[in-house]
Amino acid sequence: MALCNGDSKLENAGGDLKDGRHHYEGAVVILDAGAQYGKVIDRRVRELFVQSEIFPLETPAFAIKEQGFRAIIISGGPNSVYAEDAPWFDPAIFTIGKPVLGICYGMQMMNKVFGGTVHKKSVREDGVFNISVDNTCSLFRGLQKEEVVLLTHGDSVDKVADGFKVVARSGNIVAGIANESKKLYGAQFHPEVGLTENGKVILKNFLYDIAGCSGTFTVQNRELECIREIKERVGTSKVLVLLSGGVDSTVCTALLNRALNQEQVIAVHIDNGFMRKRESQSVEEALKKLGIQVKVINAAHSFYNGTTTLPISDEDRTPRKRISKTLNMTTSPEEKRKIIGDTFVKIANEVIGEMSLKPEEVFLAQGTLRPDLIESASLVASGKAELIKTHHNDTELIRKLREEGKVIEPLKDFHKDEVRILGRELGLPEELVSRHPFPGPGLAIRVICAEEPYICKDFPETSNILKIVADFSASVKKPHTLLQRVKACTTEEDQEKLMQITSLHSLNAFLLPIKTVGVQGDCRSYSYVCGISSKDEPDWESLIFLARLIPRMCHNVNRVVYIFGPPVKEPPTDVTPTFLTTGVLSTLRQADFEAHNILRESGYAGKISQMPVILTPLHFDRDPLQKQPSCQRSVVIRTFITSDFMTGIPATPGNEIPVEVVLKMVTEIKKIPGISRIMYDLTSKPPGTTEWE
């Protein structure tokens, strides 16, 4: 069988696999096609006590066979199997007698190799769906005939390859294929993520029943491994750790304190001006109780006026650079993160200089986690993962330090929930370990900065589609080309539910002239927000359903919000000019304080994984005839429930969080001067990321 997409590319693949330095008898190899969830697959397999190793997709089949791997899992990825830049792979991986599970892109690869076809269809699936499964298939043994799974793809299997049968469907889309005699299985959905309710059962079926894994692999003590790495890397040098006061940097500092002598650790907390209310003071007090001496630096002025160097343009491939605007005049989320990251490093260098330390003898320690590196496409985590957003602690400058071996990141293979467990093992107090994550750039990335509205040529058509969806029961009586498009993107069951919802409730759905970051089909999306308002009391289950449905039909929408208050008669088509000024930050800081204070008092803080509060440049309720300028802003409450921060769902009022708690937040935030409306984010991840920027 010929090698796919370029034989020469495989001649040098395999590396350590070919020279015999490693042996993986009984282990599972995960071939990385560039999925955002590649490391999650690895983690789920290891949770089932099976050793797993991640290697490039182009690893040759003979190398996999020689090293004794028992089975192969192929991850998802952002490419199309027919794209010119589709990653190279060896099709012999399917014919060496090893059980194979192809996930998402991996399933499409498998189907294509055996003569099936894959097409880009009008329906894009991004979110949680009910699928029907054949539970007589070995992969789905023990499951119900209908299962809840995460789907995130644009391409779909069209013609199923000879020898394979369809074992799962999402409406009329193929969601699973199998060739039981050859032990080849494909899942269009993601069994590795928490949003797939019985994903662990599916992986267990593959590992134990199909591949015959023994389940004898236990991961060595994470704490001891981290301490060993710190000691080996640092030796007698000093380590500078930048403390945000969050779980990650605190656990990182506690590990450094345990691994090294106290005088080797320089703990610095930089108040960047984007902290929450009274945050810096509480950070210093909490860490002093742990015996960690912290140097607090007020650097708000340096951050507000910080700049960085950027490419001349996104299209310019030359090494030419330009100086960015100052941070307090920057609207681009990516530029904001880069400026903040580089300013952090500059201040760290200043601290080293003030303490008369030699830079070449000092390491920079960070509490960077695996999801951070995956989302910013760092080569440490994945050679292929598509960029979703730039993390403030994974900028070009820090990558350079990492290349020089001067950055130490002992938590780089941990996910958030694992860090909490490690923190408890280290003896950290529960109030620190269980606190909600807070991004390093702080409130700076929770302000949607804008000078102009985001309105592209697709705005009118998308707005019309949303009108049809919101009034579907009436729209079906008036034939329209866009109505046919809505029907083509939905199942009969979806249309039935949409009829029911729009018959019972008076809804209004429209685009908001702002954009937020999301993740769709393993790629970054930078798309519109859909707003929904109603004269009725919100039916939250129906709203959540609409939030799942709308991004499937409108691929240029990655987030859906409910707008509290009376129906929005005239959606805003302009924005309030918004930058990172002290007044804007003070408004958001107070809104964040009110919301989190109410959540803590309710006793539900532990049930919500994270709750970003976002300030948007939107001013509602203006009479267009009076030409009143946009001068107010609106707040978004983004509740988020997750086990790994790679995927997650919003807390549904009335289920995961009491309705009265949410309404109390709305009431208190509305009292803040300059606030127009309060919105509630209904979006799961994907298609929306945890943060809005």
Curated annotation (Swiss-Prot):
Top-level taxon in the UniProt lineage: Eukaryota
Modified residues (N6-acetyllysine): K9
InterPro entries named among the record's database cross-references: Class_I_gatase-like, GATASE, GMP_synth_C, GMP_synth_GATase, GMPS_ATP_PPase_dom, NAD/GMP_synthase, Rossmann-like_a/b/a_fold
UniProt EC number: 6.3.5.2
Binding site for XMP: R337, D522, Q610, K685, E691
Chief place of localization: cytoplasm
Pfam assignment, any one: GATase
Pathway annotation: Purine metabolism; GMP biosynthesis; GMP from XMP (L-Gln route): step 1/1
Domain GMPS ATP-PPase residue range list: 217-435
Domain spans labelled Glutamine amidotransferase type-1: 27-216
One GO cellular component term: cytosol
Alphabetized PROSITE patterns for the sequence: GATASE_TYPE_1 (PS51273), GMPS_ATP_PPASE (PS51553)
Required co-factors: Mg(2+)
Compartments where located: Cytoplasm, Cytosol
Record key words, sorted: Acetylation, ATP-binding, Cytoplasm, Glutamine amidotransferase, GMP biosynthesis, Ligase, Nucleotide-binding, Phosphoprotein, Purine biosynthesis
In-chain residues carrying the UniProt-annotated modification Phosphoserine: S8, S332
Catalytic activity line of the entry: XMP + L-glutamine + ATP + H2O = GMP + L-glutamate + AMP + diphosphate + 2 H(+)
Gene Ontology molecular-function annotations: ATP binding; GMP synthase (glutamine-hydrolyzing) activity; GMP synthase activity
Complexes and interactors: Homodimer.
Name recorded for this polypeptide: GMP synthase [glutamine-hydrolyzing]
Species whose genome carries this gene: Pongo abelii (Sumatran orangutan)
Lineage: Eukaryota, Metazoa, Chordata, Craniata, Vertebrata
